[in-house]
Amino acid sequence: MSNLGKCTRCQKTVYSQEGFIAVKVPFHRSCFKCEVCNWQLVLTNYKSINGKVYCANHYPVGGLSVTPEKTHTTSDDLVMKNALNAPRVETVNEQLRGGNEKPQTSTDDLVTKNALNAPKSNLVNNQVRGTSDSAPLTSADDLVTRNALKAPKSDLVNNQVRGTSEMGPQAGIDIVTANALKAPKLETMSGYQKSVQN
């Protein structure tokens, strides 16, 4: 059994299995208590100032002072030793990332096979938009152009309505003109209309 030294509280010898070192001095587990209230402390909940240990409630909080207070955070504490011996970030990153090794990749996995067999983006675009070598669709083959060519021409429709088609004027009198010629003639005399018989 190794001897850690004399306990600060009881002045008895502290062996490694019955005590520990905190604030650079040995304590028995049962002697590690708050200086004010004698509350049992452990290494995770104590505070120290000037070599004495306190609980969180009785830790002296002072204002400005002429004498400097020595707070305790050294590398001798168990918590600090564990923190100093913890693996470094660089070591963890090298272990996880594999350092400077090349990645192990193959084309045997399913995702890579599907990606290799997928249609290429320019092929899909050519199917949808047409190839860049072909001219734009302005020929008479599209539906809009065909319908526009089949539509009746506006001057042809107007000529048929007005009777001025290329066949020449109509010879003969139509019914409207014949009825107008047969209608009784009216004379106007001082605002009155009189019927005149032929």
UniProtKB/Swiss-Prot annotation:
What does the UniProt entry say about where the protein is found? Cell projection, Pseudopodium; Cytoplasm, Cell cortex; Cytoplasm, Cytoskeleton
Q: What is its main location?
A: other
Question: InterPro entries per the record?
Answer: Znf_LIM (IPR001781)
Got any disulfides in this one, which pairs?
none
Which GO cellular component terms are attached? actin cytoskeleton; cell cortex; filamentous actin; macropinosome; phagocytic cup; plasma membrane; pseudopodium
Keyword list, A-Z: Actin-binding, Cell projection, Chemotaxis, Cytoplasm, Cytoskeleton, LIM domain, Metal-binding, Repeat, Zinc
Q: Coiled-coil segments, which residues?
A: none
Q: Which CDD domains match?
A: LIM_Mical_like
BP-aspect Gene Ontology terms: actin filament bundle assembly; actin filament organization; chemotaxis to cAMP; cortical actin cytoskeleton organization; establishment of cell polarity; response to osmotic stress
Query: Which one of the record's GO molecular function terms can you name?
Result: metal ion binding
> What does the UniProt entry report for the null mutant?
Cells exhibit normal growth, but display altered morphology and F-actin distribution. They show changes in chemotactic motility associated with increased pseudopod formation, are significantly impaired in growth under stress conditions and highly sensitive to osmotic shock.
Q: Which residues form the LIM zinc-binding domain?
A: 5-65
What is the role of this chain? Binds to F-actin and may modulate the chemotactic response during early development and contribute to the maintenance of the strength of the actin cytoskeleton.
PANTHER family for this protein: OS06G0237300 PROTEIN (PTHR24206)
Q: What is the protein's name according to its record?
A: LIM domain-containing protein D
* Protein source organism: Dictyostelium discoideum (Social amoeba)
